[in-house]
Amino acid sequence: MDEISLRPFDRMDFDRLISWIDSPEASVQWAGGFFRFPLDAAQLEGYRGSGEGELSTRRIFTACDGRGDRVGHIELSDIDRHSARICRVLVDPARRGNGIGSGMVRQVLRLAFDELRLHRVELLVFDFNMPAIGCYEKVGFVREGHLRDARRVGDKYWSLEQMSILEAEWRARQETTSAATGDDR
């Protein structure tokens, strides 16, 4: 897998992101009730604008591979002096299973812990989304709780897993990784 880089989410990313959200269920799985299906440019323009400015509590990113191809979307939200939440994580459906998700999450954690100096990063993920849960556990998140029947989708209820990682856990993983690879970043 190529190294993943993040850049600010922009208008040129709208069509690609819209093409990845092909059903009401996919919309809920990606964004909860934040957007209505079908996703459109007007909704994304308001969303993009909410991540701009010095006082914004969210950072919205497009993930790119080593060739610069757009391969995902990720947001760091609810940023305060101590914590934040990862949300609206999506990998191009044609590129899933190649480590892109974990690469995106690692980049956001670098921002959270190295640049913003946060103590904790959390997230919520639907309990049936085992590939995503595996991705988050791979980078060091731990499960903290189970929210039963937390979201209604059509005539069914979906449950959520709450997960988090603390700065000390992240740093310990980085030291272990650096020692194993000989990388002194």
Give names to the regions the model predicted.
Residues V91, G97-L111, G134-K138:
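Conserved acetyl-CoA-binding loop-helix of GNAT-fold acetyltransferases
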Residues H82, H119, V142:
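Short acidic/polar active-site loop segments enriched in Thr and Asp
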Residues L123-I133, A150-G154:
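Conserved beta-strand-loop-alpha-helix junction that forms the acyl-donor binding cleft
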Residues Y136, F141, M163:
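Conserved active-site tyrosine of GNAT-family acetyltransferases
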Residues G68-G72, P131, Y157:
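Glycine-rich acetyl-CoA-binding "A-motif" of GNAT/NAT acetyltransferases
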Residues D114-L124:
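Conserved GNAT acetyl-CoA-binding A-motif
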Residues P8-F14, S19-R96, L111, E115-L116, ...:
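Acetyl-CoA-dependent GNAT
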